[in-house]
Protein backbone atom coordinates (compact mmCIF):
# COMPACT_ATOMS: atom_id res chain seq x y z
CA UNK A 1 0.00 0.00 0.00
CA UNK A 2 2.81 2.39 1.01
CA UNK A 3 4.69 1.75 -2.26
CA UNK A 4 1.47 2.37 -4.15
CA UNK A 5 0.88 5.70 -2.41
CA UNK A 6 4.48 6.83 -3.02
CA UNK A 7 4.23 5.82 -6.68
CA UNK A 8 0.97 7.73 -7.09
CA UNK A 9 2.49 10.84 -5.45
CA UNK A 10 5.50 10.71 -7.78
CA UNK A 11 3.22 10.30 -10.78
CA UNK A 12 1.12 13.32 -9.75
CA UNK A 13 4.26 15.37 -9.12
CA UNK A 14 5.69 14.47 -12.54
CA UNK A 15 2.38 15.29 -14.20
CA UNK A 16 2.27 18.70 -12.47
CA UNK A 17 5.83 19.37 -13.62
CA UNK A 18 4.96 18.58 -17.22
CA UNK A 19 1.85 20.76 -17.01
CA UNK A 20 3.82 23.69 -15.56
CA UNK A 21 6.40 23.30 -18.30
CA UNK A 22 3.71 23.39 -20.98
CA UNK A 23 2.15 26.48 -19.39
CA UNK A 24 5.55 28.19 -19.31
CA UNK A 25 6.14 27.47 -23.00
CA UNK A 26 2.64 28.62 -23.86
CA UNK A 27 3.10 31.88 -21.96
CA UNK A 28 6.47 32.40 -23.66
CA UNK A 29 4.84 31.95 -27.06
CA UNK A 30 2.13 34.45 -26.10
CA UNK A 31 4.77 36.90 -24.90
CA UNK A 32 6.74 36.54 -28.12
CA UNK A 33 3.60 37.01 -30.16
CA UNK A 34 2.84 40.17 -28.19
CA UNK A 35 6.39 41.44 -28.69
CA UNK A 36 5.98 40.95 -32.44
CA UNK A 37 3.01 43.31 -32.32
CA UNK A 38 4.15 46.08 -29.98
CA UNK A 39 7.49 47.26 -28.66
CA UNK A 40 7.10 48.79 -25.23
CA UNK A 41 10.51 50.44 -25.47
CA UNK A 42 9.79 52.04 -28.84
CA UNK A 43 6.35 53.12 -27.71
CA UNK A 44 7.75 54.75 -24.58
CA UNK A 45 10.34 56.65 -26.60
CA UNK A 46 7.84 57.97 -29.16
CA UNK A 47 5.47 59.00 -26.37
CA UNK A 48 8.34 60.96 -24.85
CA UNK A 49 9.35 62.41 -28.21
CA UNK A 50 5.78 63.53 -28.84
CA UNK A 51 5.77 65.54 -25.63
CA UNK A 52 9.18 67.01 -26.52
CA UNK A 53 8.05 68.17 -29.97
CA UNK A 54 4.89 69.78 -28.61
CA UNK A 55 7.12 71.45 -26.02
CA UNK A 56 9.04 72.97 -28.93
CA UNK A 57 5.98 74.99 -29.93
CA UNK A 58 4.37 75.54 -26.56
CA UNK A 59 6.14 77.24 -24.95
CA UNK A 60 9.50 77.01 -26.79
CA UNK A 61 8.80 78.68 -30.12
CA UNK A 62 6.22 81.01 -28.56
CA UNK A 63 8.83 82.32 -26.10
CA UNK A 64 11.55 82.45 -28.76
CA UNK A 65 9.39 84.59 -31.05
CA UNK A 66 7.79 86.50 -28.18
CA UNK A 67 11.12 87.83 -27.00
CA UNK A 68 12.14 88.91 -30.50
CA UNK A 69 9.20 91.24 -31.18
CA UNK A 70 8.53 94.63 -29.62
CA UNK A 71 6.76 94.71 -26.26
CA UNK A 72 3.51 95.97 -27.81
CA UNK A 73 3.23 92.82 -29.96
CA UNK A 74 4.41 89.99 -27.72
CA UNK A 75 0.94 88.70 -26.81
CA UNK A 76 -0.07 88.56 -30.46
CA UNK A 77 2.77 86.14 -31.19
CA UNK A 78 1.95 83.99 -28.16
CA UNK A 79 -1.72 83.99 -29.16
CA UNK A 80 -0.93 82.99 -32.73
CA UNK A 81 1.26 80.06 -31.66
CA UNK A 82 -1.27 78.85 -29.09
CA UNK A 83 -4.32 79.19 -31.34
CA UNK A 84 -2.56 77.45 -34.22
CA UNK A 85 -1.74 74.49 -31.97
CA UNK A 86 -5.45 74.17 -31.20
CA UNK A 87 -6.63 74.72 -34.79
CA UNK A 88 -4.21 72.22 -36.31
CA UNK A 89 -5.07 69.62 -33.66
CA UNK A 90 -8.75 69.67 -34.63
CA UNK A 91 -7.94 69.72 -38.34
CA UNK A 92 -5.56 66.78 -37.90
CA UNK A 93 -8.27 64.67 -36.31
CA UNK A 94 -10.93 65.76 -38.79
CA UNK A 95 -9.11 65.20 -42.08
CA UNK A 96 -5.43 66.23 -42.20
CA UNK A 97 -4.09 62.93 -40.87
CA UNK A 98 -6.13 61.10 -43.48
CA UNK A 99 -4.89 63.40 -46.25
CA UNK A 100 -1.28 63.07 -45.11
CA UNK A 101 -1.10 59.33 -44.41
CA UNK A 102 -4.17 57.81 -46.04
CA UNK A 103 -4.53 56.12 -49.42
CA UNK A 104 -5.33 58.66 -52.10
CA UNK A 105 -6.21 56.15 -54.80
CA UNK A 106 -5.45 57.56 -58.25
CA UNK A 107 -4.11 60.75 -56.61
CA UNK A 108 -1.92 58.92 -54.12
CA UNK A 109 1.26 60.31 -55.63
CA UNK A 110 0.22 63.74 -54.36
CA UNK A 111 -2.35 63.45 -51.59
CA UNK A 112 -4.06 60.90 -49.37
CA UNK A 113 -7.78 60.22 -49.25
CA UNK A 114 -10.51 60.96 -46.74
CA UNK A 115 -11.30 57.38 -45.72
CA UNK A 116 -9.69 57.96 -42.32
CA UNK A 117 -11.41 61.27 -41.60
CA UNK A 118 -12.11 61.79 -37.90
CA UNK A 119 -9.64 58.94 -37.37
CA UNK A 120 -12.12 56.38 -38.69
CA UNK A 121 -10.96 52.85 -37.99
CA UNK A 122 -8.52 53.93 -35.29
CA UNK A 123 -8.72 51.99 -32.03
CA UNK A 124 -6.51 51.37 -29.04
CA UNK A 125 -5.28 48.17 -30.70
CA UNK A 126 -4.47 49.76 -34.10
CA UNK A 127 -0.78 49.47 -34.91
CA UNK A 128 1.70 51.47 -36.96
CA UNK A 129 4.72 49.23 -37.21
CA UNK A 130 5.50 48.14 -33.66
CA UNK A 131 3.96 51.16 -31.92
CA UNK A 132 0.27 51.95 -31.43
CA UNK A 133 -1.15 54.02 -34.28
CA UNK A 134 -2.56 56.40 -31.68
CA UNK A 135 1.01 57.29 -30.74
CA UNK A 136 2.01 57.76 -34.38
CA UNK A 137 -1.01 60.01 -34.99
CA UNK A 138 -0.09 62.19 -32.03
CA UNK A 139 3.62 62.28 -32.90
CA UNK A 140 2.95 63.44 -36.44
CA UNK A 141 0.40 65.96 -35.15
CA UNK A 142 3.13 67.78 -33.23
CA UNK A 143 5.07 68.25 -36.49
CA UNK A 144 1.96 69.65 -38.13
CA UNK A 145 1.50 72.05 -35.22
CA UNK A 146 4.95 73.61 -35.31
CA UNK A 147 5.04 74.22 -39.07
CA UNK A 148 2.44 77.03 -39.32
CA UNK A 149 3.69 78.37 -35.99
CA UNK A 150 7.12 78.85 -37.59
CA UNK A 151 5.51 80.91 -40.36
CA UNK A 152 4.28 83.40 -37.75
CA UNK A 153 7.78 84.86 -37.60
CA UNK A 154 7.56 86.02 -41.21
CA UNK A 155 4.54 88.29 -40.73
CA UNK A 156 4.91 89.14 -37.04
CA UNK A 157 3.60 92.52 -35.87
CA UNK A 158 1.45 93.32 -38.92
CA UNK A 159 -1.08 90.62 -39.90
CA UNK A 160 -4.71 90.48 -38.79
CA UNK A 161 -5.48 87.60 -36.45
CA UNK A 162 -8.53 86.60 -38.51
CA UNK A 163 -6.47 86.61 -41.71
CA UNK A 164 -3.74 84.53 -40.06
CA UNK A 165 -6.31 82.01 -38.87
CA UNK A 166 -8.02 81.52 -42.23
CA UNK A 167 -4.74 81.53 -44.14
CA UNK A 168 -3.33 78.82 -41.86
CA UNK A 169 -6.46 76.69 -42.24
CA UNK A 170 -6.23 76.74 -46.03
CA UNK A 171 -2.43 76.45 -46.10
CA UNK A 172 -2.43 73.27 -44.02
CA UNK A 173 -4.77 71.65 -46.55
CA UNK A 174 -3.07 72.85 -49.72
CA UNK A 175 0.59 72.77 -48.68
CA UNK A 176 1.38 70.84 -45.51
CA UNK A 177 -0.80 67.78 -46.03
CA UNK A 178 0.25 67.16 -49.67
CA UNK A 179 3.99 67.64 -49.07
CA UNK A 180 3.82 65.49 -45.93
CA UNK A 181 2.06 62.77 -47.93
CA UNK A 182 4.48 63.02 -50.83
CA UNK A 183 7.51 62.68 -48.54
CA UNK A 184 6.36 60.42 -45.69
CA UNK A 185 2.96 59.06 -46.68
CA UNK A 186 3.84 56.93 -49.69
CA UNK A 187 3.62 59.69 -52.29
CA UNK A 188 5.75 60.96 -55.14
CA UNK A 189 8.88 62.22 -53.41
CA UNK A 190 9.23 59.36 -50.98
CA UNK A 191 8.81 56.83 -53.77
CA UNK A 192 11.53 58.61 -55.75
CA UNK A 193 13.89 58.06 -52.85
CA UNK A 194 14.03 61.54 -51.30
CA UNK A 195 15.91 61.37 -48.01
CA UNK A 196 14.22 63.61 -45.45
CA UNK A 197 14.52 62.07 -42.02
CA UNK A 198 12.66 64.59 -39.90
CA UNK A 199 11.26 67.44 -41.99
CA UNK A 200 13.74 69.46 -44.03
CA UNK A 201 11.16 69.74 -46.81
CA UNK A 202 7.93 69.05 -44.94
CA UNK A 203 8.55 71.51 -42.11
CA UNK A 204 11.46 73.87 -42.75
CA UNK A 205 11.36 74.59 -46.50
CA UNK A 206 7.57 74.81 -46.38
CA UNK A 207 7.57 77.20 -43.43
CA UNK A 208 10.44 79.29 -44.78
CA UNK A 209 8.99 79.73 -48.26
CA UNK A 210 5.51 80.52 -46.93
CA UNK A 211 6.96 83.10 -44.54
CA UNK A 212 8.90 84.77 -47.36
CA UNK A 213 5.85 84.91 -49.64
CA UNK A 214 3.75 86.44 -46.86
CA UNK A 215 6.45 88.95 -45.94
CA UNK A 216 6.65 90.13 -49.55
CA UNK A 217 2.87 90.17 -50.02
CA UNK A 218 2.15 92.09 -46.81
CA UNK A 219 4.98 94.55 -47.27
CA UNK A 220 7.46 95.76 -44.69
CA UNK A 221 6.55 96.95 -41.22
CA UNK A 222 6.12 100.69 -40.86
CA UNK A 223 9.54 102.12 -40.10
CA UNK A 224 11.50 99.08 -41.27
CA UNK A 225 15.18 100.04 -41.72
CA UNK A 226 14.48 103.56 -40.41
CA UNK A 227 13.08 102.98 -36.92
CA UNK A 228 14.96 100.69 -34.48
CA UNK A 229 13.03 97.46 -33.80
CA UNK A 230 15.18 95.58 -31.28
CA UNK A 231 13.97 92.43 -29.50
CA UNK A 232 12.11 93.50 -26.38
CA UNK A 233 13.23 90.61 -24.15
CA UNK A 234 16.25 88.54 -25.12
CA UNK A 235 16.03 86.58 -21.87
CA UNK A 236 12.67 85.23 -23.04
CA UNK A 237 14.21 84.42 -26.42
CA UNK A 238 17.10 82.51 -24.83
CA UNK A 239 14.66 80.55 -22.66
CA UNK A 240 12.62 79.67 -25.74
CA UNK A 241 15.73 78.74 -27.71
CA UNK A 242 16.86 76.42 -24.92
CA UNK A 243 13.47 74.70 -24.98
CA UNK A 244 13.74 74.33 -28.74
CA UNK A 245 17.16 72.70 -28.42
CA UNK A 246 15.92 70.12 -25.93
CA UNK A 247 12.67 69.53 -27.80
CA UNK A 248 14.55 68.97 -31.05
CA UNK A 249 15.89 65.69 -29.70
CA UNK A 250 12.32 64.39 -29.87
CA UNK A 251 11.88 65.99 -33.29
CA UNK A 252 14.89 64.28 -34.88
CA UNK A 253 15.68 61.23 -32.75
CA UNK A 254 11.97 60.49 -32.39
CA UNK A 255 11.67 60.32 -36.17
CA UNK A 256 13.47 56.99 -36.03
CA UNK A 257 10.16 55.71 -34.61
CA UNK A 258 12.23 53.36 -32.45
CA UNK A 259 14.55 53.40 -29.47
CA UNK A 260 17.49 52.04 -31.43
CA UNK A 261 20.89 52.87 -32.91
CA UNK A 262 19.35 55.19 -35.48
CA UNK A 263 17.69 57.26 -32.75
CA UNK A 264 20.94 57.40 -30.80
CA UNK A 265 22.92 58.65 -33.78
CA UNK A 266 20.17 61.13 -34.68
CA UNK A 267 20.30 62.58 -31.16
CA UNK A 268 24.08 62.88 -31.26
CA UNK A 269 24.27 64.58 -34.66
CA UNK A 270 21.39 66.88 -33.73
CA UNK A 271 23.37 68.16 -30.76
CA UNK A 272 26.53 68.55 -32.83
CA UNK A 273 24.61 70.45 -35.51
CA UNK A 274 23.16 72.84 -32.94
CA UNK A 275 26.49 73.54 -31.25
CA UNK A 276 28.47 74.01 -34.46
CA UNK A 277 25.76 76.21 -35.98
CA UNK A 278 25.77 78.41 -32.89
CA UNK A 279 29.53 78.90 -32.90
CA UNK A 280 29.78 79.43 -36.66
CA UNK A 281 27.14 82.17 -36.54
CA UNK A 282 28.71 83.73 -33.45
CA UNK A 283 32.22 83.92 -34.94
CA UNK A 284 30.94 85.21 -38.29
CA UNK A 285 28.94 87.94 -36.59
CA UNK A 286 31.86 88.73 -34.27
CA UNK A 287 34.20 89.18 -37.22
CA UNK A 288 31.70 91.44 -38.97
CA UNK A 289 30.36 93.62 -36.15
CA UNK A 290 33.15 93.37 -33.60
CA UNK A 291 30.94 91.81 -30.91
CA UNK A 292 29.33 88.39 -30.44
CA UNK A 293 25.65 88.68 -29.56
CA UNK A 294 23.24 86.54 -27.59
CA UNK A 295 20.71 86.89 -30.41
CA UNK A 296 23.32 85.66 -32.86
CA UNK A 297 24.33 82.54 -30.96
CA UNK A 298 20.74 81.38 -30.40
CA UNK A 299 19.78 82.10 -34.02
CA UNK A 300 22.79 80.08 -35.14
CA UNK A 301 21.58 77.25 -32.94
CA UNK A 302 18.19 77.23 -34.67
CA UNK A 303 19.89 77.37 -38.07
CA UNK A 304 22.08 74.40 -37.17
CA UNK A 305 19.11 72.42 -35.89
CA UNK A 306 16.95 73.17 -38.91
CA UNK A 307 19.74 72.25 -41.31
CA UNK A 308 20.65 68.95 -39.63
CA UNK A 309 16.98 67.90 -39.47
CA UNK A 310 16.66 66.19 -42.89
CA UNK A 311 20.08 64.56 -42.49
CA UNK A 312 19.84 63.52 -38.86
CA UNK A 313 19.05 59.86 -39.46
CA UNK A 314 21.59 59.41 -42.23
CA UNK A 315 24.85 61.19 -41.36
CA UNK A 316 27.60 60.65 -38.82
CA UNK A 317 29.23 63.05 -36.34
CA UNK A 318 31.74 64.55 -38.77
CA UNK A 319 29.03 65.16 -41.33
CA UNK A 320 26.96 66.87 -38.66
CA UNK A 321 29.89 69.09 -37.74
CA UNK A 322 30.28 70.25 -41.34
CA UNK A 323 26.54 70.67 -41.88
CA UNK A 324 26.10 72.67 -38.68
CA UNK A 325 29.07 74.91 -39.44
CA UNK A 326 27.87 75.61 -42.97
CA UNK A 327 24.39 76.30 -41.58
CA UNK A 328 25.68 78.98 -39.24
CA UNK A 329 27.74 80.68 -41.94
CA UNK A 330 25.32 80.46 -44.87
CA UNK A 331 22.15 81.24 -42.92
CA UNK A 332 23.87 84.28 -41.40
CA UNK A 333 24.76 85.60 -44.85
CA UNK A 334 21.24 84.85 -46.09
CA UNK A 335 19.78 86.86 -43.21
CA UNK A 336 21.97 89.86 -44.01
CA UNK A 337 21.20 89.63 -47.72
CA UNK A 338 17.42 89.44 -47.36
CA UNK A 339 17.13 92.27 -44.84
CA UNK A 340 19.85 94.63 -46.00
CA UNK A 341 20.36 93.93 -49.70
CA UNK A 342 16.90 93.22 -51.07
CA UNK A 343 15.03 94.96 -48.24
CA UNK A 344 12.47 92.24 -47.42
CA UNK A 345 11.04 92.39 -43.90
CA UNK A 346 10.91 88.74 -42.90
CA UNK A 347 10.35 89.89 -39.33
CA UNK A 348 12.04 87.06 -37.44
CA UNK A 349 14.19 85.63 -40.25
CA UNK A 350 12.12 82.54 -40.95
CA UNK A 351 13.22 82.07 -44.56
CA UNK A 352 16.98 82.64 -44.14
CA UNK A 353 17.08 80.39 -41.07
CA UNK A 354 14.50 77.67 -41.75
CA UNK A 355 14.04 77.93 -45.51
CA UNK A 356 17.70 78.24 -46.42
CA UNK A 357 18.61 75.80 -43.66
CA UNK A 358 16.10 73.23 -44.92
CA UNK A 359 17.35 73.59 -48.49
CA UNK A 360 20.99 73.31 -47.44
CA UNK A 361 20.41 70.33 -45.17
CA UNK A 362 18.33 68.44 -47.73
CA UNK A 363 21.02 68.86 -50.39
CA UNK A 364 23.95 68.06 -48.09
CA UNK A 365 22.23 64.84 -47.01
CA UNK A 366 23.12 63.38 -50.41
CA UNK A 367 26.80 63.93 -49.68
CA UNK A 368 27.24 63.21 -45.99
CA UNK A 369 24.90 60.22 -45.87
CA UNK A 370 27.49 58.41 -47.98
CA UNK A 371 29.74 56.03 -46.08
CA UNK A 372 32.66 57.75 -47.83
CA UNK A 373 32.00 60.77 -45.60
CA UNK A 374 31.16 58.93 -42.40
CA UNK A 375 27.45 58.52 -43.12
CA UNK A 376 25.32 55.45 -42.59
CA UNK A 377 25.28 54.64 -46.30
CA UNK A 378 22.65 54.84 -49.04
CA UNK A 379 21.54 52.86 -52.06
CA UNK A 380 22.28 55.48 -54.71
CA UNK A 381 25.52 57.15 -55.68
CA UNK A 382 26.15 60.64 -54.35
CA UNK A 383 25.42 62.23 -57.73
CA UNK A 384 22.19 60.30 -58.26
CA UNK A 385 20.98 61.01 -54.74
CA UNK A 386 21.89 64.69 -55.06
CA UNK A 387 19.66 64.98 -58.13
CA UNK A 388 16.79 63.39 -56.21
CA UNK A 389 17.35 65.77 -53.30
CA UNK A 390 17.53 68.74 -55.66
CA UNK A 391 14.29 67.73 -57.34
CA UNK A 392 12.62 67.42 -53.94
CA UNK A 393 13.81 70.89 -52.92
CA UNK A 394 12.73 72.58 -56.16
CA UNK A 395 9.40 70.76 -56.22
CA UNK A 396 8.64 71.73 -52.62
CA UNK A 397 9.54 75.39 -53.23
CA UNK A 398 7.35 75.63 -56.33
CA UNK A 399 4.40 73.81 -54.75
CA UNK A 400 4.60 75.84 -51.56
CA UNK A 401 4.92 79.16 -53.40
CA UNK A 402 1.92 78.55 -55.65
CA UNK A 403 -0.42 77.29 -52.96
CA UNK A 404 0.71 79.82 -50.36
CA UNK A 405 -0.48 82.50 -52.79
CA UNK A 406 -3.76 80.61 -53.21
CA UNK A 407 -4.19 80.47 -49.43
CA UNK A 408 -3.54 84.22 -49.22
CA UNK A 409 -6.19 84.91 -51.85
CA UNK A 410 -8.72 82.72 -50.05
CA UNK A 411 -8.03 84.53 -46.77
CA UNK A 412 -8.55 87.87 -48.53
CA UNK A 413 -12.00 86.78 -49.68
CA UNK A 414 -13.10 86.44 -46.05
CA UNK A 415 -11.11 89.19 -44.31
CA UNK A 416 -10.23 91.74 -46.97
CA UNK A 417 -6.79 93.28 -46.51
CA UNK A 418 -4.61 90.84 -44.56
CA UNK A 419 -2.71 93.60 -42.85
CA UNK A 420 -3.71 95.59 -39.76
CA UNK A 421 -4.25 99.32 -40.22
CA UNK A 422 -1.40 101.78 -39.75
CA UNK A 423 -3.05 103.02 -36.56
CA UNK A 424 -3.34 99.49 -35.16
CA UNK A 425 0.26 98.75 -36.08
CA UNK A 426 1.41 101.90 -34.32
CA UNK A 427 -0.66 101.08 -31.22
CA UNK A 428 0.53 97.49 -31.21
CA UNK A 429 -1.27 94.32 -32.21
CA UNK A 430 -1.66 93.23 -28.59
CA UNK A 431 -4.08 96.05 -27.82
CA UNK A 432 -5.63 96.50 -31.25
CA UNK A 433 -6.33 92.80 -31.93
CA UNK A 434 -6.65 91.27 -28.46
CA UNK A 435 -7.39 94.13 -26.07
CA UNK A 436 -4.59 93.05 -23.77
CA UNK A 437 -1.09 94.13 -22.85
CA UNK A 438 1.74 91.87 -21.78
CA UNK A 439 3.21 94.43 -19.41
CA UNK A 440 1.06 96.57 -17.10
Specify the residue positions occupied by each region the protein language model found.
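C-terminal segment of classical bacterial N-terminal signal peptides
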Residues: 23-30
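A generic structural signal for short, solvent-exposed coil/turn residues
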Residues: 2-4, 25, 421
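Sec-dependent N-terminal signal peptides
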Residues: 15-20
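Glycine- and aromatic-enriched membrane alpha-helices
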Residues: 30-440
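Single conserved hydrophobic/aromatic residue that forms the stacking wall/gate
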Residues: 1-12
Amino acid sequence: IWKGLVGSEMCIRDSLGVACGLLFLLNADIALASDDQISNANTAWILTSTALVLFMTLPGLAFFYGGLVRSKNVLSVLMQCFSLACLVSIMWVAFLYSLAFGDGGSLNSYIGGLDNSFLAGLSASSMSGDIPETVFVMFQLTFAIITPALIVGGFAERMKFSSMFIFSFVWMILVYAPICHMVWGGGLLGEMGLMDFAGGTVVHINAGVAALVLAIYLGNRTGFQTVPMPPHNLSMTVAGASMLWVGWFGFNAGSALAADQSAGMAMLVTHIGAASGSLAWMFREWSRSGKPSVLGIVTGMVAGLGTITPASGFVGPMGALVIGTLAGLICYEATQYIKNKINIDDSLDVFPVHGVGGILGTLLTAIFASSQFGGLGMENSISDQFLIQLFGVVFTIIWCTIFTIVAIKVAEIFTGNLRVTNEDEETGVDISSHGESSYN
